[in-house]
């Protein structure tokens, strides 16, 4: 069996998330819920109403109806506890959704009998995650002992002074001391939580590691084999009409952006010396134009700034290039003629200083333009 040494791919992580296998730092979720509950308890949990109710019953000595009495206490409990519980539930759900990247694990909902396999249960019992949980539990015991000691040193006067407090304030003081104890525990446990999250992240990626064969197979499935790629090229070709294909073939070059815009440039000095926009396509049709141009030997110059400028300043096909873009177009034409002359073996004439840097200044792709310009010269000849 091949050793799994490769990191999980994005597709592997997405497929695992659909099965419920996501990175889950449960202690961080618990930390957020407990901290939110501790901070919101003094404002949301009002025990003075409970104390006032007990005081009223004790002072009047009335004998209420048991059913009505229980119903009144239930309503009071819901009014006090419902906002607190809803807030904690909402705060607890948010970190879980963020960790799962808002992915619904639909495949984990189905009934799976393999989860009852005792062999898998034994493997989980003696796994690295079980060792991590055991060590974490021991660390939490130590953290709790330290928390109690520090809390006793800081607040023992407040604890022993509770017997002198008024009954109406007793509940509020207990809540305040409990909140302080909880926050102190969370502060002491924070290093353990961080280490636990880091180890959990490492174990999660370790479980999803892939061997090289799996990576190659996944790449083949996602990118497709040669037959599928050929079919995709055929689909791109079908996006173009015969008129567009003819315009591409007659163009002097195609300037691309590099995949979202394709502009065809045609120049005929015998008719008019101004460059002419013969093709103007975007998105999938632009990709089809680029593929067809490469297949026909028409130079393709990948120049983001020039392509965007021509597309913006020349809003229609079969229009002249705007005067703001003529300089850039002519620089590309001069450069292509120099490359064509060099590929034919003839001595290229010396370019003027402002044209020698045309490919770099406009982002021209020398490899693409140079490789296809020779074919273009043979076609034009």
From Swiss-Prot:
Keywords: Cell membrane, Membrane, Transmembrane, Transmembrane helix, Virulence
Any one cellular-component term (Gene Ontology): plasma membrane
Membrane-spanning parts: 28-48, 80-100, 134-154, 175-195
Topology versus the membrane: Multi-pass membrane protein
Source taxon at top rank: Bacteria
Biased composition (Low complexity): 364-381
Location in the cell: Cell membrane
GO terms (BP aspect): protein secretion
Region feature (Disordered): 343-381
Role this protein plays: Part of the bsa type III secretion system, is involved in the intracellular replication of invading bacteria inside the host cell. Probably necessary for the lysis of the vacuole membrane and escape into the host cell cytoplasm.
Protein family according to the UniProt entry: Belongs to the type III secretion exporter family.
Name of the featured protein: Secretion apparatus protein BsaZ
Native source species: Burkholderia thailandensis (strain ATCC 700388 / DSM 13276 / CCUG 48851 / CIP 106301 / E264)
Gene: bsaZ
């Amino acid at each position: 069996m091949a050793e799994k040494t490769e990191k999980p791919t994005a597709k592997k992580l997405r497929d695992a998330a659909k099965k419920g296998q996501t990175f889950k730092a449960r202690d961080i979720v618990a930390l957020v819920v407990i901290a939110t509950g501790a901070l919101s308890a003094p404002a949301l949990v009002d025990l003075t109403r409970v104390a006032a109710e007990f005081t009223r019953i004790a002072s009047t000595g009335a004998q209420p109806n048991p059913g009505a009495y229980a119903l009144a206490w239930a309503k009071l409990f819901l009014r006090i506890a419902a906002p607190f519980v809803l807030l904690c539930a909402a705060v607890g759900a948010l970190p879980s959704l963020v960790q799962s990247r808002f992915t619904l694990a639909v495949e984990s909902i189905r009934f799976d009998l393999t989860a009852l396999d005792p062999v898998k249960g034994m493997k989980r019992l003696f796994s690295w995650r079980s060792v991590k949980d055991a060590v974490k539990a021991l660390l939490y015991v130590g953290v709790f002992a330290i928390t109690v000691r520090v809390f006793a040193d800081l607040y023992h006067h407040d604890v022993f002074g509770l017997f002198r407090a008024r009954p109406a304030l007793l509940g509020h003081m207990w809540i305040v001391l409990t909140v302080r104890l909880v926050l102190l525990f969370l502060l002491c446990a924070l290093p353990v939580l961080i280490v636990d999250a880091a180890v959990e992240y490492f174990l999660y990626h370790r479980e999803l590691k892939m061997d090289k064969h799996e990576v190659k197979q996944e790449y083949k499935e996602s990118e497709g084999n040669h037959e599928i790629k050929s079919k995709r090229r055929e689909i791109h070709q079908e996006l173009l009409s015969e008129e567009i294909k003819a315009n591409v073939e007659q163009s002097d070059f195609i300037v691309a952006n590099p995949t979202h815009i394709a502009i065809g440039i045609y120049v005929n000095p015998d008719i008019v010396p101004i460059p002419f926009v013969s093709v103007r396509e975007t998105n999938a049709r632009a990709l089809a134009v680029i593929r067809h141009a490469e297949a026909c030997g028409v130079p393709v110059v990948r120049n983001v700034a020039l392509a965007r400028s021509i597309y913006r300043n020349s809003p229609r096909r079969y229009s002249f290039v705007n005067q703001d873009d003529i300089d850039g177009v002519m620089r590309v034409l001069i450069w292509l003629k120099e490359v064509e002359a060099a590929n034919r073996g003839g001595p290229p004439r010396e370019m003027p200083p402002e044209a020698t840097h045309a490919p770099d200044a406009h982002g021209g792709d020398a490899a693409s333009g140079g490789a296809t310009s020779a074919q273009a010269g043979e076609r034009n000849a």
